[in-house]
């Protein structure tokens, strides 16, 4: 499927400089041309986020994907399970 050319959307007489001054609404058309000429050209810059999740994604899951997130998950489960076991063990001794 070939991309549709964008030039066919804009008729050549609309942006013609000689045609701009010929119509009585040329001031309005001049403002429109001025507005569109000030718009940025090219692709939009990539947004950078400074959150922990964006940093983690860039470091471990982006272009440099590795197995480190699996190790982090295993470590987090071990820490959580140890903390919960310790809490319930102390709670059991307080009740008896």
UniProtKB/Swiss-Prot annotation:
Please state where this protein is localized.
Mitochondrion; Mitochondrion inner membrane
The protein here is known as: ATP synthase subunit f, mitochondrial
> Which GO biological process entries does UniProt record here?
proton motive force-driven ATP synthesis; proton motive force-driven mitochondrial ATP synthesis; proton transmembrane transport
Which family is this protein grouped under?
A: Belongs to the ATPase F chain family.
* Record bears the keyword Transit peptide: yes
- Entry keyword set: ATP synthesis, CF(0), Hydrogen ion transport, Ion transport, Membrane, Mitochondrion, Mitochondrion inner membrane, Transit peptide, Transport
Output a single Gene Ontology CC term carried by this record. mitochondrion
Primary role: Mitochondrial membrane ATP synthase (F(1)F(0) ATP synthase or Complex V) produces ATP from ADP in the presence of a proton gradient across the membrane which is generated by electron transport complexes of the respiratory chain. F-type ATPases consist of two structural domains, F(1) - containing the extramembraneous catalytic core and F(0) - containing the membrane proton channel, linked together by a central stalk and a peripheral stalk. During catalysis, ATP synthesis in the catalytic domain of F(1) is coupled via a rotary mechanism of the central stalk subunits to proton translocation.
- Its source organism is Schizosaccharomyces pombe (strain 972 / ATCC 24843)
Q: What is its main location?
A: mitochondrion
Note the InterPro entries from the entry.
ATP_synth_F0_fsu_mt_fun
């Amino acid at each position: 499927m070939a991309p549709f050319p964008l030039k066919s959307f804009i008729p050549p007489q609309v942006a013609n400089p000689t045609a701009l001054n010929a119509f009585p609404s040329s001031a309005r058309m001049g403002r429109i041309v001025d507005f569109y000429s000030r718009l940025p050209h090219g692709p939009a810059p990539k947004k950078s986020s400074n959150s922990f999740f964006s940093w983690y994604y860039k470091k471990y899951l982006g272009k440099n994907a590795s197995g480190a997130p699996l190790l982090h998950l295993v470590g987090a489960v071990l820490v959580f399970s140890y903390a919960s076991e310790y809490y319930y063990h102390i709670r059991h001794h307080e009740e008896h």
